[in-house]
Amino acid sequence: MQEIEKLRILQTEREALKNRNRVIEHEKKTEDHTESVCPECKSRQLVHDYERAELVCQNCGLVIDDDFIDRGPEWRAFDHDQRMKRSRVGAPMTFTIHDKGLSTMIDWRNRDSYGRAISSKNRAQLYRLRKWQRRIRVSNATERNLAFALSELDRMASALGLPRNVRETAAVVYRDAVDKNLIRGRSIEGVAAAALYAACRQCSVPRTLDEIAEVSRVSRKEIGRTYRFISRELGLKLLPTSPIDYVPRFCSGLTLKGEVQSRAVEILRQAAERELTSGRGPTGVAAAAIYISSILGGERRTQREVAEVAGVTEVTIRNRYKELAEKLDIEIIL
């Protein structure tokens, strides 16, 4: 009877967390719709200055609001230990966990809140409670789908070294696909990989389909097909990937200096103005610009080295670099 009562308490807590989640989402939507456009120039480039408690338009400089609420803590901390000691809350809400991180779990260590070991008499009961609590956290097919897909997203993002904002965006894209029932008839891994590819493009952290396919469990063809489907059905507005977005990562992989990177970006801007990048793969054009820049900057890299980092062939680099050098009147002494 005691176990049944405890399970009822756990279910009640779960319902309370769901209600709290709905309230948080409602408040977030309300906040997002208020003061999202500058009344002077109609720009959406608004910046929150938390030190001055001001909402400022980045385009025209208008101070839209000068008295918004500081949602941060009232205490100050100067290192990680102080922050952990003074914090009275748990981890922030995240879309990368199926329950958004709002639920709790019974720890696997058999110790109480004071750190004392649980007696052998109560360990069997604790084991049963832990088992049922795990089942309650993932109670239906949708949550099981999310739990598996989001863990797969996190695995792929970690393998690619993607930042937190890309992971959150990918999780939101996948959740939208689940809400619109776009998963039916498609593999979870394929949709997760497509969502990650879309998030990379949305956040201007480009990764090629080949790179995504390398860390996923599905083929490049399936990822591309699924990506086109969900982007069309969800109405994702994704601009074509610019070769400039690849330059920092490729230069970092080749250990080139900032001057070489800046020169490569300038070459690509001139090429874009003359429409030399349209209809060509962005990675190949970026690799060719870096190859030219490395020669001009006195940090020569071979075509093979650049090709390995960029994931293209040496033939592609030769064709693109000759074209750029000829059209932009760049004199290269090999």
Swiss-Prot record:
Q: List the TFIIB-type zinc finger ranges.
A: 34-65
Q: Do the record's keywords include Metal-binding?
A: yes
| Example of a GO MF term | DNA-binding transcription factor activity
Q: Name one Pfam family in it.
A: Zn_Ribbon_TF
Return the InterPro entries for the record. Cyclin-like_dom, Cyclin-like_sf, TFIIB, TFIIB_arc, TFIIB_CS, TFIIB_cyclin, Znf_TFIIB
Q: Which UniProt keywords apply?
A: Metal-binding, Repeat, Transcription, Transcription regulation, Zinc, Zinc-finger
Q: PROSITE patterns, per this entry? A: TFIIB, ZF_TFIIB
Q: Which Gene3D superfamilies does the record cross-reference, listed alphabetically?
A: 1.10.472.170, Cyclin-like
Q: Which residues bind Zn(2+)?
A: C38, C41, C57, C60
GO BP terms = transcription preinitiation complex assembly
Could you name the Gene Ontology cellular component terms for this entry?
A: transcription preinitiation complex
UniProt KW Transcription regulation keyword: yes
Q: Where are the sequence repeats?
A: 151-234, 245-326
Which top-level group of life is the source organism from? Archaea
Entry function: Stabilizes TBP binding to an archaeal box-A promoter. Also responsible for recruiting RNA polymerase II to the pre-initiation complex (DNA-TBP-TFIIB).
The UniProt similarity line reads: Belongs to the TFIIB family.
The record's section on NCBIfam families has: PRK00423.1
Q: What is this protein called?
A: Transcription initiation factor IIB
Protein's organism: Methanosphaerula palustris (strain ATCC BAA-1556 / DSM 19958 / E1-9c)
